[in-house]
Amino acid sequence: MVLPFLVLYLTRELGFSLARAGSMLAVYGASAIVFGPIGGRLSDRIGALPVMRVSLVASGLVLLLFPLAKNFAAVAAMTVLWAGCAEMFRPASLAAITHVVAPEQRRQAFALNRLAINLGMSIGPALGGFLATVSFHAMFAVDAVTTLLAGTLLAITPWRAFSGVNSEAANRQGPRIGPATILHDGRFLVFLGGVILVGIVFFQHESALPLYLVQYLHLSPAFYGMLFTINTLLIVGLEVPIVSATAQWPNRRSLIIGCFLFAIGFGALGLIASPAGVIATVVVWTFGEMLLFPAMSAHMAEIAPENRRGAYMGAYSMSLSISLTIGPWMGTQLLALLGPVRVWFVMFALGALAAQLMVFSVPRRRQSHVAVAAGS
């Protein structure tokens, strides 16, 4: 709820310059890159559920205290704390899903997880915008309270599904796998490269896309907002059915097709100037999103050693954070350097390259039905 309005809060409430306020987003992104893998490693050591609980409670407390920070250094410190606490949740939650869901159902489970996230992201910014018009302090307070409530719910609910998951026992079983081992997994690193590239393309919807629509196609900000609504409605209505319908597909197929749909959807913007055409491109890359992201999480769950799922999910989370940190900046720079047409051809090339990296990094033998057989 707070993050989309952080720059607005810093400029209007605290009087920061736009450059200083914008730098806080970079601070948040850099912190996410660092703390995501830490959250994954902690999940392997103490269990995913404790990490999720601490992450939510600590994030809520930091949000309560955030308005007390008034100068640049204090705000930067609060932003690091906030990002550190919040971003440890993602790899822990992915590891938790992997632990409790059967291999043949993981892609659907990750799709349901994304459904919940998208519903929250559709409600949160709208509520945050309303609260920001009343009081920025109210916005921080409501976000803090809802986060604390989520942490409390996780703390008091008896999660029987986790009763058989003993991370310490898992650590004693099998070889110890540290960061150096992950770095020597060549296919895994190539896969992460594909994740970063397709993430850069995806996050253009936050930077180059709105600038292109408003400044070059002379469409209204309301039209850009409508595209978000279309994207969310498609995901809420179709992602789970699509993932269920393609459940027998190997992850490899979903990954490759998803990357190509991103490449086509964003690349076609260089050839289209009409509102209807723009809507069509959003539909195309949204279908890519619905295929790609559940399959990426499922592939991570499939290849990660049982006693290091958190570490692998942390590396995956870090890759997405890298994309989020550099993607919007890269898009705006390319838009200024190459112009409003060629920037989208670059995005097509990046998406196609990501698909090729998926071909190299996900061999045919690592297919979802193989994982089912191994897990049965």
Residue ranges and their predicted role:
Residues M78-L119:
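Cytoplasmic helix-loop-helix junction between adjacent transmembrane helices
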Residues G29-P37, M121-S122, T232-V240, L324-T325:
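Residue-level signature of mid-helix packing/kink "hotspots" within the transmembrane helices
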Residues A132-V145, Q333-G351:
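A membrane-interface helix-boundary motif in multi-pass transporters
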Residues P67-M78, G270-T281:
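Helix-loop junctions at membrane interfaces in 12-TM secondary transporters
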Residues W159-G193, S376:
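Juxtamembrane intracellular "pre-TM" segments in multi-pass secondary transporters
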Residues M1-G29, L189-G194, V198-L227:
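Helix-loop boundary and gating motifs at the non-cytosolic
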Residues F35-G47, L238-N251, L335:
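Helix-to-loop junctions at the C-terminal end of transmembrane segments
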Residues P50-L64, R253-G267:
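Structural signature of the two symmetry-related core transmembrane helices
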